[in-house]
Amino acid sequence: SKYPSTNIQIEVFKNQIEIIKKSNYSFNNPDNFKEEFDIPKLNKEVLITIDDAFQSFYLEAWPYLKKNKIPFILFVSTEPVGRRGYMTWDQIREVESKEFAFIGHHSHTHNYLIDETNDQFILDIEKANRIFVKELGYIPSLFSYPFGEYSKFMRDYISKNFEFAFGQHSGVIDINKDKFELPRFCLLYTSDAADECDS
């Protein structure tokens, strides 16, 4: 697969979900996450995020999430949509039509944007914005930095144009976290995979 360090086998994924349930965590709906971010939580909650909109997600994880109505954010990079190994816009719209499924912004190219100029970065985001409006009718308000990497300029630009942004550094989200540098934990490819998430 393209990014093996952040992929997960479907049976391992299902097992992780069951562990979360048995540990008395609830699944946070992204709408509630946005509205209640500044409110301290008494209960343990998990927000599921999925990057890249691979076809494998649609064929394997999506049926399970749909059956169980588990809320999640699917972060989409607009350039690869419809290419080999990636979901189509029709499939993305199908997912997005469910009230528990949310589409997030993951740039246009999914390049290492931190290595590009500030102008190139802005052009990439703006191109994705135009495609999102054409295909979905809106620009997603949640952003995920490609490869979890960002500069101060990128963070500041995203903060002016989105509601929240996620990296790939590990950590628990609480009200003291920067809304545009939110951490995430990886659900890893196999149960004994390495602990580091690097792509």
Predicted regions and their residues:
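Conserved small/polar residues in nucleotide/adenosyl-binding loops
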Residues: 189-196
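Short secondary-structure boundary segments
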Residues: 147, 168-170
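Metal-dependent polysaccharide deacetylase catalytic core of the NodB/CE4 family, i.e.
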Residues: 1-4, 43-46, 55, 66-153, ...
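Noncatalytic alpha-helical scaffolds and linker/capping helices
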Residues: 51-53
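Short, electropositive alpha-helical surface patch
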Residues: 125, 154-166
